[in-house]
Amino acid sequence: TGASAHPRIPTWVADLRVPGVVLHSSEYLYPRQVLTSDVLIVGGGNSGVQLARELAPSHAVTLAVRTPRRHQPAARYLRRQFLARGPRPEPVFEDSYEQLRDAGVRICPAVAKAGKSSVTFVDGTVTTPSSVILATGFDPGDDWLPDSARIDPPQRAMTGIPGLFVAGIPQYGGRGSDTIAGVWRDATAIARRIIERP
């Protein structure tokens, strides 16, 4: 269970055949796993940027980025994350895209679809990667919850089942719930609701 329990795999991956590997970032350990000379990394968040930086010295790296991310110091983000409202892309704390370009990384837009051996980006350009790493994030491990537990709109730590609360999953608690620093808000809300129950 948790906010990052299941690797998120794009549906187009099922149509793709490459001579090398197709890995989710959760399966990646070191550059030697990617035996081919080139690699497409899908996802421009922190994991994708870190992988691009690590693989750039030994591979021809293409980084597919769906949403441009702001680059900022982690400390500034941590101060502001709790004040943020609404869904926004997480900022990138590692190298900027410009630094990656300087390291030889090719930055491309998001992947639209895949054919047998090729990938088409949303701008219509096509590449034929030898290997692919999916830095596409995770889905929460809330599949153990019955459908009746999900409420819309979500309320901090609440479910649709009286007496059942959820902590640590942003879909139930809000931005930052999946961090040590942020889960306290879920715990506080749960404690308050338990105390206030008749």
What positions do the PLM features span?
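Flavin (primarily FAD) cofactor-binding/catalytic cores of flavoenzymes
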Residues: T1-P198
